[in-house]
Amino acid sequence: MRNREAAERRGRAGESLAALWLRLKGYRILARRVKTHAGEIDLVAAAPFGPVCFIEVKARGQARSAAESVMATQQARIARAASLYLAGRPHLSRRGFRFDIIAIAPYALPVHHRDVWQAEF
């Protein structure tokens, strides 16, 4: 159980760091840890003068491996959750959307991978 608790703490810390990083870049955090019956979205943010971003945060030993760690099944689950999130917020739907990954690695600045995959709904 300790490993799971430690992983949960690392995940929350990574999400907090990613949210701070986004705010410093001018993004507005709309939601954290959005849970739907389709899945969970780590962060939802509004890009400055841009789309709504659904962001998966990955804490890894190396930032490079994080973007590759979100497989097609997880992408589909996040896309379904994003669809449900936007369905209840039509004012956000008009902005467009994209799917991003933020990689968190020890002793390094976060790496923001924009528009990593596409989804239609």
Locations of the language-model features?
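Short acidic/glycine-enriched loop/turn segments that link adjacent beta-strands
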Residues: 37-40, 107
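Conserved catalytic cores of phosphodiester-cleaving nucleases, focusing on short active-site segments
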Residues: 22, 41-45, 49-66, 78
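Short, solvent-exposed loop/turn elements at beta->coil junctions and helix N-caps
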Residues: 32-35, 100-102
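Positively charged, solvent-exposed patches that mediate nucleic-acid binding
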Residues: 24, 47-49, 92-93, 121
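Protein kinase-like catalytic core scaffold
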Residues: 39, 51-53, 100, 111
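Mid-chain, well-packed structural core segment of small domains
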Residues: 63-93
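Acidic-basic catalytic patches of nuclease active cores, encompassing PD-(D/E)XK
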Residues: 1-32
